[in-house]
């Protein structure tokens, strides 16, 4: 087992606090991951890393930033009033862990409904493992990154998927 990280120190400290490092080490030690490689996508609330599973296949490792005030500001409105969050302490780490769990469950529901979403694999604390969408470690582009002609052909598919989900 090995961990490869090619980011600068600031990014490492932002993503890999002691608790998150412990969680990643648990995933490696329990055979959920064989390797954790570099970041493939970065956002305000999380980073997505390429991971290698025990069979040598790619997996996406989404790590929610535990120190992010942006997370608390941006997601609190979705948590208030949701019965799944009523018994969760409202400290940032607990909310982030619950948000990762909620995303895992929503991906399961969407997959069961036959939607084209990454297959959720496992969630622990603020770390979510899911199917890697891409080839040879290169993630598939977001819809906003696809040429307009190609993106427009997806519109009807997206509307249909939303109807299937709801």
Mark where each language-model region is.
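Conserved ATP-binding subdomain of kinase catalytic cores across diverse folds
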Residues: 4, 12-139, 163
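AlphaC helix of the protein kinase catalytic domain
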Residues: 137-148
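Conserved kinase catalytic-core segment
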Residues: 149-166
């Amino acid at each position: 087992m090995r961990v490869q990280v090619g980011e600068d120190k600031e990014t490492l400290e932002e993503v890999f606090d002691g608790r998150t490092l412990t969680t990643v080490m648990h995933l490696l030690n329990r055979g959920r991951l064989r390797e954790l490689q570099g970041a493939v996508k970065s956002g305000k609330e999380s980073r997505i890393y390429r991971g290698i599973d025990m069979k040598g296949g790619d997996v996406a490792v989404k790590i929610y930033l535990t120190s992010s005030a942006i997370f608390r500001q941006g997601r609190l409105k979705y948590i208030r009033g949701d019965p799944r969050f009523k018994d969760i302490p409202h400290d940032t780490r607990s909310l982030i862990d619950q948000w990762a769990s909620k995303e895992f469950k929503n991906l399961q529901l969407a997959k069961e409904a036959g939607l084209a979403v990454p297959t959720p694999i496992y969630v622990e604390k603020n770390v979510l493992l899911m199917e890697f969408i891409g080839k040879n470690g290169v993630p598939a582009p977001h819809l906003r990154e696809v040429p307009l002609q190609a993106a427009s052909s997806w519109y009807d598919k997206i509307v249909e998927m939303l109807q299937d989900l709801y």
